Amino acid sequence: MAETEVAHPALPPILSPRDRATVIDAILADRLDRVIPQVMQVHQIDMWVLVAREYLEDPVVATMLDAKSLRARRRTILVFYNPGGGKPVERLTVSRYGLGGLFQPAWNPDVEPDQWKALAQLIAARNPQKIALNVSSKSAFGDGLTKSQHDELVAALTPQLRERIVSGEGPSISWLETRTPMEMQLYPGILRLAHAVLGEGHSAKVVKPGVTTTDDVAWFYRARLSELGVDTWFHPSVGVHRQGVKDLLSGDTVIQPGDLIWTDFGITYLRLNTDTQHLAYVLKPGETDAPAGLKAGLAAANRIQDAVTGAFQVGISGNDILAAARKTAMDQGLKPSIYSHPLGYHGHGAGPAIGFWDNQNPDPRGEGRVNPGTVWSIELSAFAPVPEWGGQEVQFRTEEDAFYDGKTVRYLDGRQTSLTLIPSK
């Protein structure tokens, strides 16, 4: 981890599919051993039942399947049971297929053909006091149990057990947002891979002023990732700010000398996601540096980043961080817009939001508490005038990925503190 990122970093080695599977399964085994007992203790549940159907995976179940299983088949049921007394958490699967040795098979269809009855018998035999099911009106991450599967599951239980059902929202968010030491050994390298590819697009190799369009750059990223065998979780966004033009230009806009290029880019690798926004300036003929006003705008965004990362505290809400960071930034005479979010198994990950681009006030989605051992996308904008452009106000969008250990926020692979320069010829 570093404060300042390397300009145009070299592309790190990319694992083969087989080697990726080995790493993914090692991470998953470690997470199941390490995170699940913690989750069940924190949320005071002794059983957690997750159900996924083929082509309709619960977002949590999708992160618990080994690299060969990949998807739910027919109906995949996972059960975690904490017997208490210091005994290890049971990991069971009530399904026809094994799951990489990570869950103990607990259904013999020859003995009990009805999968729901088999599950009900398993639950009754353990007599849990709280049974978490993934049903939530507040979070999609805790709402993966479909209506039909919920109804059939509940119908199979005794009235007494039905009364013990609680929402799996809390456990789902905790499982998804928590990063392990093993993951954090790898995450900086994953972001370095993203930074390397992003840097390729912000270079003369790709950008030919007067010829290349912003869409050309976006599709370069898609093609490059396909070539590397790496996924993206969203289509890259590329646009330009131009002197004399108020709004961001994109689509078939031809990039010209003097343009400020903005790119929003993210990858998925080893099941973890990145999310980065960087800025590049296309030099005019005879220029050797960007205008001072553009450099000052990026510096203003860096100061807002400092305001956000400096506001992190364990146990406060995303709304609290938003309010504190905005006050700090505005007290410095800055004009911020803050819309940061958790990052991990999902690009817009589980956990509290820290503002939204269209809402800088407290939001129900920002009420959750901030926990240590979590990764964040520090996403925001600084609005600043550019004297060289006649005082035109420009939105300097930045986004950098960082880890919060409970004490400090550290960037996984540094952050952009100087504009990337692209020659005009």
PLM feature segments, named:
Residues 2-425:
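Active-site neighborhoods and metal-handling regions in enzymes and metal-associated proteins
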